[in-house]
Each structure stands twice: as structure tokens, then as C-alpha cells.
């Protein structure tokens, strides 16, 4: 099972929802990419996000270059984000808040951002000209759209791109536990992770896996991700409350 919100991953672990299985592939993963104790879950995917814009609507010299540039009033009613159920959006809120404080999101809320469930909706609106800019724009979505020739550009802020994990683990009372273990062995392996990166255009937590087609290595980014996931988990209710207010979903 994979969950894309670390708050739910840690809660599921507390509820003893995972069955321990120490795949031999775990040796290829850094300690911070694995559960404590090991064998409950492992980062199967790293999702990177930055800023995207439509170059047909926003000239390159006028495009946002940093997260702070997104506070410019000219993006009012022209910027989209993810909804509060997104683990990636929670990470973005958390990390930008650490960088710039609470005032950042208060000012951002004045832009009337539109929130959507899927990165596909975010990029569709940006490419179609309904919005000019996307915040928490997934790098994988950008690569997919760019490969199709869509008018979209990706901005790597100098203050860093946001990165969130997609942990994978085996649930208790799985109907076919042996098959689940075999799948985890394959998925966490070099061939499994390489195939996943090629198909989904995401990054792997394994250092020996090439970057997604058309993309650059995650090592070339300054990465913004929580170092204390338990502290991050404690902010979930606050994030949902504030984000729903910012996006008009309260």
C-alpha cells in the first residue's frame, strides 16, 4: 500500500496497520527514507514540486523566479494550488512557512488561489490559459506536459524545490502476504525503481536510479523537506484549517 501524506503514514504506523517486512533491497535506501523500526514502510517515490507557468501568457522575464515572487498582486485570480487533502501541499505549506513565516500564506490568500485535487487539473488550467501560474506544481506533471509540446515552463526557486515522499508498505492481514513481499522486493529494486521513474516521471529515493526521462537528477535541486516528520504530523489539523480558509473551501 502507498500513502502520499506522511501524516497518515505515521498515524497508520501508530495504529499498527503495517506488517513488518525487511526486504533485502532496504540496504540501498538511506535511514531517513525508511521507517523506524525498519521494514514497516519505505520511500518508494519522491515527488518534487516547484512553480509552473504558461509562457504564452507570462514572458520569461516577467515569470516568478522564487516563492516570494508569487506574492505579487498580478497573480491575483490567476494562480492555482492543491487542496488540503494533498500531502505534497501540506509539505509546501510547512516548508515555506518555516522559510518566511505565517505572513507568507496570509498574503498569498489575498490572491484568491484556486485549489484542485489533481496535478492534472493544475496543469490543464495553466496550459489552457485559465490560470497563469501553478504553485506546488509537480515536476513529473511538468515533464509529462512538456513532452507533449504543451506551453508550460518550470521554475526551480533558488530557495529550493519542495519534495514529499510516497511511502510503500505491506498492510496487516493482506490476502496474499507472500506475493506482497515479492512485489515489495521488485518495486524497491533497481529495475523496479527505474521502471517506475520511466513511467511516472518521478524520482527515486535510490541513488543509483537515473532521473526521469527529460528531467534532471534530484541532486541538482536544493530540496525542501521536513527533517522531523513527527513535528510535521502535529501541524496537520492547523494546515487543513488554514488552507481551506485560504482556498475558500472552509
Predicted regions and their residues:
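Solvent-exposed, polar/charged alpha-helical surfaces in well-ordered, non-transmembrane soluble domains
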Residues: 10, 68, 106, 124, ...
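A ligand-binding cleft/hinge motif common to bilobed small-molecule-binding domains
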Residues: 9-11, 132-151, 200
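A bilobed periplasmic-binding-protein/Venus flytrap-type ligand-binding module shared by bacterial periplasmic
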Residues: 50-57, 164-176, 195-196
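C-terminal capping/gating helix-and-loop segments adjacent to ligand/active sites or protein-protein/ligand interfaces
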Residues: 194-250
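Periplasmic-binding protein-like
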Residues: 28-31, 47, 75-85, 107-109, 115-116, 187-210, ...
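Short amphipathic alpha-helical coupling segments at ligand-binding clamshell hinges
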Residues: 104-107, 166, 175-187, 195-198
Amino acid at each position: 500500500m502507498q500513502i502520499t501524506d506522511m501524516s497518515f503514514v505515521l498515524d497508520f504506523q501508530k495504529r499498527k496497520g503495517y506488517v513488518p517486512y525487511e526486504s533485502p533491497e532496504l540496504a540501498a535506501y538511506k535511514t531517513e527514507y525508511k521507517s523506524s523500526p525498519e521494514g514497516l514502510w519505505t520511500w518508494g517515490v519522491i515527488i518534487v514540486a516547484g512553480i509552473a507557468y504558461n509562457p504564452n501568457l507570462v514572458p520569461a522575464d516577467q515569470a516568478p523566479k522564487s516563492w516570494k515572487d508569487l506574492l505579487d498582486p498580478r497573480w491575483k485570480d490567476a494562480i492555482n494550488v492543491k487542496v488540503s487533502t494533498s500531502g505534497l501541499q501540506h509539505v509546501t505549506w510547512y516548508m515555506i512557512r518555516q522559510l518566511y513565516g505565517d505572513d507568507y500564506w496570509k498574503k498569498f490568500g489575498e490572491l484568491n488561489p484556486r485549489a484542485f485535487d489533481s496535478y492534472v487539473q493544475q496543469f490543464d488550467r495553466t496550459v489552457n490559459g485559465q490560470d497563469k501560474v501553478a504553485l506546488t506544481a509537480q515536476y513529473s506533471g511538468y515533464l509529462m506536459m512538456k513532452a507533449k509540446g504543451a506551453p508550460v515552463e518550470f521554475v526551480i526557486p533558488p530557495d529550493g524545490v519542495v519534495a514529499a515522499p510516497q511511502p510503500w508498505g505491506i498492510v496487516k492481514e493482506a490476502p496474499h502476504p507472500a506475493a506482497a513481499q515479492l512485489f515489495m522486493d521488485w518495486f524497491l529494486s533497481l529495475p523496479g525503481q527505474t521502471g517506475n521513474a520511466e513511467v511516472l516521471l518521478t524520482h527515486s529515493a535510490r541513488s543509483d536510479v537515473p532521473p526521469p526521462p527529460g528531467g534532471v537528477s534530484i541532486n541538482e535541486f536544493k530540496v525542501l523537506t521536513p527533517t522531523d516528520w513527527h513535528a510535521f504530523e502535529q501541524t496537520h489539523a492547523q494546515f487543513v484549517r488554514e488552507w481551506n480558509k485560504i482556498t475558500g473551501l472552509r
